[in-house]
Amino acid sequence: MINQAAIMAWKDNAPWVHAAMVEQDLIICKALVCIFGDEFLASQLAFRGGTALHKLYLTPQQRYSEDIDLVQIHPGPIKPILLRLGEVLSWLPDKVTKQKRYNNTMLFRMESEVPPVQPLRLKVEINCYEHFCVLGLQKVPFKVSNPWFDGECKITTYALDELVGTKLRALYQRKKGRDLFDLQVALQSGNLNVARVLECYQRYMEFVVDKVPTYKQYVQNMEEKMQDHEFLGDMDLLLREDAGRFYPTEAYKQVRAAFIEQLPGKRE
């Protein structure tokens, strides 16, 4: 789908370990321009998740990310959005749409162009139930300049503090070391308002659970993960080629001091 010269040219923007990852990164970037360059989709969808953090705020991108996470801004029928999304992404092959009550997913499958040939999969997932925003939606300029594709748009997304607040929720909810990495990088950017991050975390956590985890529950959750090999090794192949190692123990110390120690609950 993409000539090898264009993929290699993109490596300056996406210095990932494998050429297939560079190719996927370029595909993601074109897809973002196609989605948010469309007036209808830009008014209906907001970009969220790790890919949004690294593509829009934590630049240059510190880790590889393979999916596009979107949120339906307003409650309403999802079918018109899915139809238009399929149209603007019609250049991607083998589309499969999976619909559930709270999220809808489009999967595209292809093979990499640079040997050794590897299967590639792009997942575009739409959260269809969190129709709210704490700090207001943002419009962030985004540009792709490559021999294969050249384009730009303004991406509808959330404020940095809100994206990081949802990351703090994700760190508790799932077992992926990349969430810990993202929080550390966000802290090191020096651009965070920790009080606003915690406000957003509280709002998003309240939306999905009856009782927000206490300080003690969050610490226990993290201490279990810090003994889990899958969690600790999640970042092994996701770092830039020119990056140093990721040290989860040090990252946890920083994230705990900045965020977790501010959570309500007894200290024992």
Where in the sequence are the language-model features?
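Structured mid-to-C-terminal alpha-helical surface segments
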Residues: 1-45, 56-63, 68, 72-268
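Glycine-rich beta-strand-to-loop/alpha-helix junction loops that act as flexible
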Residues: 47-52
